[in-house]
UniProtKB/Swiss-Prot annotation:
The lineage of its organism: Eukaryota, Metazoa, Chordata, Craniata, Vertebrata. Disulfide bonds: none annotated. It holds the Pfam family DUF4681. Residues 16-26, 67-79, 113-127 have a biased composition (Polar residues). This is Uncharacterized protein C12orf54.
Amino acid sequence: MAQHPCQDQEQKVEMTSKQQRSTSIEETMRPQEKQVTITETLWDQVLTVFKDIQKELQEDARIRGMSNCSMTPMTSAPRTGSIRPPDSLMTPKLRRLQFSSGEQPSGGRIHNLKTQLFSQSAYYPGP
């Protein structure tokens, strides 16, 4: 017995909707799995950045005399009357430059040094 043309079309629509539902279920599962999964490459990058930050902090502590090896605090130098910006405004590289040269640059000179350092940085677009 032949089926009515409407029944054929209904069966095709039903089959198509079942396929679409199974496909959509698979598609919704994949993004969730991708979000949950962290790749080894990403972890390697995170660990590398963490180690770099840790080295930077250790270097800064060593320069300031606060490393774990030396428990004796550094004596503070007598004030010479020069103006020194707060440490929060200085980058670690700028602090290294200041301590390695042994002098305390004036405010204008600090701004110039910051501008030079930031212009060389890949992370800072510039002043």
